[in-house]
Amino acid sequence: MSTHRNQRVIVGISGGVDSSVSAYLLKALGYEVEGLFMKNWDEDDGTEYCTALSDLEDAQKVCDKLGIKLHTASFSAEYWDRVFEHFLDEYRAGRTPNPDILCNKEIKFKAFLDYAQALGGDLIATGHYAQFSRFGEHTYLMKGADPSKEQSYFLHAVPGQALARTLFPVGGLLKKEVRRIARELDLITHDKKDSTGICFIGERKFSDFLKTYLPAQPGKIVTDKGEEIGRHQGLMYHTIGQRQGLGIGGLKGYDDAPWYVVEKDLDNNELVVAQGGDHPRLFSAGLTASKLDWINGVPAKSSFSCYAKTRYRQPDQLCRVDVQDGGVRVTFDKRQRAVTPGQSVVFYDGARCLGGGVIESVFK
């Protein structure tokens, strides 16, 4: 077994099973391991929403069991400034953002990394299902081994310099293997439910949360032919491809086919819907994206073919990427369904994640 006794690793301990097993694996390899519990949200901390208090208790029990020290730190101010305000700005603009990606870039692999350095850490580690490959001076982000949990999509904006100081101990394992290890160690987190959704929203209704910060602007729901068939409470509560929660079922003069959101008309504050999950207006030939993050630098070629995802867990889609000033134009081999401005498009060369950007617009 290789040893790393001269290297101190600060593990982000969330109170979940993945980070718990990550800490164990690193200690077993001989690293000097300490944990850090990050608190990123201060607005409310009831157990029905964010579970920071119970998560901290679980994190402490895991560290006690493993015999490692647990530090705690609040990055709430950084989260508000660098992530949450951007989240609100995007919704004001009628887009659908993904705060987890920005949180990884700005908090988990920047604020946390800086804090870990101050603690004397040589490296950081997280429980993400991703891997890395090193070649010369470059560190490449690679897909995790478990296709059902693979998380490189959320890590595409993390710069290569940060990845070079990061370990992903469970990235080469399947989730069931991680739970088995935790169960054999009798860790309190071995059967803990995976966290889902955005932490600061938790299990509450999304529209109720958003109303707390942004005033609703009701408007018309219109068909793809321009006929008004209902009212919406705010475009920000809806996303492209949405079927549930429109409140327009059983309309006279229309068949029973389900309605889907195909456009958010910001100029007229209208929600445009069409019937059928395969309606042509749900599909796009390509997209434009900005705010590009290339993990290992801008590609040498201004035009190249690769694979891309426009949402988490989507199968890789073959495409052509044309690099332009300030962004890219992406043309897919096959038309893509429900491509959503504000979400991220992430590029791959096989198992290697190249980077990605924020979707600005689509073209049909």
UniProtKB/Swiss-Prot annotation:
The keyword tRNA-binding applies. It comes from Hahella chejuensis (strain KCTC 2396). It comes from the Bacteria. Residues 149-151, 311-312 are annotated as: Interaction with tRNA. This is tRNA-specific 2-thiouridylase MnmA. Disulfide bonds join 103-199. It holds the Pfam family tRNA_Me_trans_C. Catalyzes the 2-thiolation of uridine at the wobble position (U34) of tRNA, leading to the formation of s(2)U34. GO terms for biological process: tRNA wobble position uridine thiolation. Belongs to the MnmA/TRMU family. The keyword Mitochondrion does not apply. HAMAP family: tRNA_thiouridyl_MnmA. InterPro entries: MnmA-like, MnmA-like_C, MnmA-like_central, MnmA-like_central_sf, Rossmann-like_a/b/a_fold. The record marks 128, 343 as: Interaction with tRNA. Keywords: ATP-binding, Cytoplasm, Disulfide bond, Nucleotide-binding, RNA-binding, Transferase, tRNA processing, tRNA-binding. Its EC number is 2.8.1.13. The active site is at residues 103, 199. It is found in: Cytoplasm. Residues 98-100 are annotated as: Interaction with target base in tRNA. ATP binds at residues 12-19, 38, 127. PANTHER family: MITOCHONDRIAL TRNA-SPECIFIC 2-THIOURIDYLASE 1, TRNA 5-METHYLAMINOMETHYL-2-THIOURIDYLATE -METHYLTRANSFERASE. GO terms for molecular function: ATP binding; tRNA binding; tRNA-uridine 2-sulfurtransferase activity. GO terms for cellular component: cytoplasm. It catalyses: S-sulfanyl-L-cysteinyl-[protein] + uridine(34) in tRNA + AH2 + ATP = 2-thiouridine(34) in tRNA + L-cysteinyl-[protein] + A + AMP + diphosphate + H(+). The lineage of its organism: Bacteria, Pseudomonadati, Pseudomonadota, Gammaproteobacteria, Oceanospirillales.
